[in-house]
């Protein structure tokens, strides 16, 4: 008799995706981040759902409702901080997942990669609108500054900004619609994740060597389920340590001051995971130029498959490309640090240099290094 998991219409899908899935035998721990992102998404949806039960999306009561969750709701404080720090863990996993894709040439699976970039945009949008909800100072001014960037669009800019605001400033209408967006977007992310997996399972996983692994595949369960559980336990451990020992480590103290349109915080800055893009935005002296650079800093990922000039897929055997990759990682971290610094010398100059290097590495230096490595193969 055939096992029910192989015959039942629903269980068959789960079986082919998570149990009997043929997987390369040599994928490393860098391949853990996909499942960790799935775990993060589930945790965020669950904690978010419980927060939404007690939150009120109204300018007069939003801040108080968040404080009420922390003080009066049973275990509300831990739900709130798991949600806030869960977002940080989400982005750590996202950046590691993208870095893995860049290093090992996973972007050659173009459909999977492009859906991944769309997912990144959606997660960033969700995190941005979510940060506005507690209605603290940084929530309000962050929303004002970032939405205002759209006014740089010629001709329709101002109309567009006022349309998003639902008025002439960030106010009640803005908060209400941002809450609606923040509630619906995670489910869109969930749907996109399924499409992402669908495209991935059409081709099968890549592996560290970047060569076909058709001759050496093993079932996903138990080999990789146990490996994923280990990764999940480590992620949960880090998240719990962050939440229970230093819940406000990654947050901004300004957000404990209720939103006040009449007083601007000394330094307006987004959460740490947007700082690299914020640094690129600030590096361009022109408003429209800055907005375009900001967009391009993420959209550039879509061009990476087109910029692949190497005869090898993975960077495993390409020392020049490896050096440039780690230079890009260092540059990303530098931009993240600079994004959190005030707009003054020397940070401005460093930010401009780091921004130029960011685009130069991806668009020019890495494709050139690949061509040089191709030549070296013939020696």
UniProtKB/Swiss-Prot annotation:
Keywords: Electron transport, Heme, Iron, Membrane, Metal-binding, Mitochondrion, Mitochondrion inner membrane, Respiratory chain, Transmembrane, Transmembrane helix, Transport, Ubiquinone. Heme b b566 binds at residues 97, 196. One of its GO terms (biological process) is mitochondrial electron transport, ubiquinol to cytochrome c. Belongs to the cytochrome b family. One of its GO terms (molecular function) is metal ion binding. Component of the ubiquinol-cytochrome c reductase complex (complex III or cytochrome b-c1 complex) that is part of the mitochondrial respiratory chain. The b-c1 complex mediates electron transfer from ubiquinol to cytochrome c. Contributes to the generation of a proton gradient across the mitochondrial membrane that is then used for ATP synthesis. Binds 2 heme b groups non-covalently. InterPro entries: Cyt_b/b6_C, Cyt_b/b6_C_sf, Cyt_b/b6_N, Cytb/b6-like_sf, Cytochrome_b, Cytochrome_b_C_euk/bac, Cytochrome_b_N_euk/bac, Di-haem_cyt_TM. A ubiquinone binds at residue 201. This is Cytochrome b. It comes from Mesoplodon peruvianus (Peruvian beaked whale). Its main location: mitochondrion. Pfam families: Cytochrom_B_C (PF00032), Cytochrome_B (PF00033). It is found in: Mitochondrion inner membrane. It is a multi-pass membrane protein. Heme 1 (or BL or b562) is low-potential and absorbs at about 562 nm, and heme 2 (or BH or b566) is high-potential and absorbs at about 566 nm. The gene is MT-CYB. One of its GO terms (cellular component) is respiratory chain complex III. It comes from the Eukaryota. Heme b b562 binds at residues 83, 182. The chain crosses the membrane at residues 33-53, 77-98, 113-133, 178-198, 226-246, 288-308, 320-340, 347-367. CDD domains: cytochrome_b_C (cd00290), Cytochrome_b_N (cd00284). PANTHER family: CYTOCHROME B. Its cofactor is heme b. The cytochrome bc1 complex contains 11 subunits: 3 respiratory subunits (MT-CYB, CYC1 and UQCRFS1), 2 core proteins (UQCRC1 and UQCRC2) and 6 low-molecular weight proteins (UQCRH/QCR6, UQCRB/QCR7, UQCRQ/QCR8, UQCR10/QCR9, UQCR11/QCR10 and a cleavage product of UQCRFS1). This cytochrome bc1 complex then forms a dimer.
């Amino acid at each position: 008799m055939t096992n029910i998991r192989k015959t039942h219409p629903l269980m068959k899908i789960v079986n082919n995706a998570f149990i009997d899935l043929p997987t390369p035998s040599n994928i490393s721990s860098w391949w853990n981040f996909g499942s960790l992102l799935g775990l993060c998404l589930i945790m965020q949806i669950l904690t978010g759902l419980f927060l939404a039960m007690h939150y009120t999306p109204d300018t007069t009561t939003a801040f108080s409702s968040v404080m009420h969750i922390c003080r009066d709701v049973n275990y509300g404080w831990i739900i709130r901080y798991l949600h806030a720090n869960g977002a940080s863990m989400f982005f750590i996993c996202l950046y590691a997942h993208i870095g893995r894709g860049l290093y090992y040439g996973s972007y050659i699976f173009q459909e999977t990669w492009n859906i991944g970039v769309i997912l990144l945009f959606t997660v960033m949008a969700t995190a941005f609108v979510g940060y506005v909800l507690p209605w603290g100072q940084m929530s309000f001014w962050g929303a004002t500054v970032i939405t205002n960037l759209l006014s740089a669009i010629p001709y329709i800019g101002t109309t567009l900004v006022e349309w998003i605001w639902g008025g002439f400033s960030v106010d009640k209408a803005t908060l209400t619609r941002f809450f609606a967006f923040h509630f619906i977007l995670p489910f869109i992310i969930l749907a996109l994740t399924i499409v992402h997996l669908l495209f991935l399972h059409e081709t099968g996983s890549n592996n560290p060597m970047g060569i076909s692994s058709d001759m050496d595949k093993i079932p996903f369960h138990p080999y990789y389920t146990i490996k994923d559980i280990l990764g999940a336990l480590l992620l949960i451990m880090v998240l719990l340590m962050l939440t229970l020992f230093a819940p406000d480590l990654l947050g901004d103290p300004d957000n404990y001051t209720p939103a006040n349109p009449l007083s601007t915080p000394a330094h307006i800055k987004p959460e740490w995971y947007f700082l690299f893009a914020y640094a690129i935005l600030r590096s361009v002296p022109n408003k429209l130029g800055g907005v375009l650079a900001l967009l391009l800093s993420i959209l550039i990922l879509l061009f990476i498959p087109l910029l692949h000039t190497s005869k090898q897929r993975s960077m495993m055997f390409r020392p020049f490309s490896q050096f440039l990759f780690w230079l890009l990682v260092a540059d990303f971290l530098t931009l993240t640090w600079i994004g959190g610094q005030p707009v003054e010398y020397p940070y401005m100059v460093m930010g401009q240099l780091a921004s130029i290097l960011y685009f130069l590495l991806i668009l020019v230096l890495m494709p050139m290094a690949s061509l040089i490595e191709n030549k070296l193969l013939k020696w």
